[in-house]
Amino acid sequence: MGQKVHPHGLRVGVIKEWDAKWYADKKNFADNLVEDHKIRNFVKKNSYAAGVSRIEIERAAKRIKLNIYTAKPGMIIGKGGQGIESLKNQLQKIVSNKNILINIVEVKRPEADAQLIAENIAQQLEKRIAFRRAMKQSIQRAMKSGVKGIKTACSGRLAGAEIARTEHYNEGTIPLQTLRADIDYGFAEADTTYGKIGVKVWVYKGEVLPARKNINEKEEANA
């Protein structure tokens, strides 16, 4: 049975960038990695209602810059910036002797963001909404927003069934093996009374590299 590689990992260095942008020697690498993990978990847990899509971490000598991509920036920033100051103070306890800079980036189309779609489906499952309805509604909203294709999968004791299973729904195209295809991937878990249900979402937003190819062709023609 074929297993699918993570769409982001496959495309890093081709059309995707790293979520952690820093370099460290052997002595500090593990500490930085654990610190990153703690930061991501804390921000995600603390600002779950704000719809955090992803967190980029950049490091300099004594400085950490966080780029937080969120659907509802106002919920994180708070009234007069109080929320962001509170978040910064709490994060300061996790990272010692380092200055933290927080940059909030708004996700313009949350209905086309794979991570936010997965979390939305998971939240609906926790509210006992039928999984098929939750998946189909998310697919319809994503297709209306202009994506080229979307695929969703729910795994677990669906509708309280005795035997766990996986159900997929998709619309449009999802070229997983095409490296120039901009495929967004999201994963979330729903805690239901019957146990956990895993939600996976793949969103195809179109090809990324053709413009560069056309520029090269024009340069060759001019030469």
Swiss-Prot record:
UniProt KW keywords: Ribonucleoprotein, Ribosomal protein, RNA-binding, rRNA-binding
Coiled-coil segments: none
Keyword Phosphoprotein: no
Gene field: rpsC
Family: Belongs to the universal ribosomal protein uS3 family.
Origin: domain of life: Bacteria
NCBIfam families: rpsC_bact
Function: Binds the lower part of the 30S subunit head. Binds mRNA in the 70S ribosome, positioning it for translation.
GO CC, one annotated term: cytosolic small ribosomal subunit
Subunit details: Part of the 30S ribosomal subunit. Forms a tight complex with proteins S10 and S14.
Pfam families: KH_2, Ribosomal_S3_C
SMART domains referenced in this protein's UniProt entry, alphabetically: KH
HAMAP family: Ribosomal_uS3_B
Protein name stated in the entry: Small ribosomal subunit protein uS3
GO molecular function term, any single one: rRNA binding
UniProt keyword Membrane present: no
GO biological process, one term: translation
KH type-2 domain residues: 39-108
